[in-house]
Amino acid sequence: MPCAQAVDELGRFMEANSRPVDTVYVFGFSSGAYVKAGRTSASRFFWSRPVIVGFNDGRPGYGVTGLLDDLRRSTPAIVALQQRDWYPDVDDSAHFFMSTPSLAGWLRDGYQLARGPEGFDVWIKRALPQ
């Protein structure tokens, strides 16, 4: 589970590396980072567990497909994948996201890995070609 310092550091990172009008996304258990950053979540899934365990998977708007629809619609400036948040109970968020082909493909196509706070794999939206 995240410590308060990690959530605070992630929030400060998101605030410094995005604009107030941007959405950001944390796939994990650190939704306090949105408040610290003053940013809106790019998805209704403000924590990862429902997606990881497959809550209502197969129903429109839920599961991996529902999350991916939200992310495509909102195009967050920053995506943070939390490490070691749910393990060993279920797969941790970063590993789950990157092991799911549709999510990993979406992320790699539009984002680049950046150096961010410890405990998170942080991805920044790539600049559009001029």
What feature does the model see in each segment?
Residues 1-129:
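Extracytoplasmic
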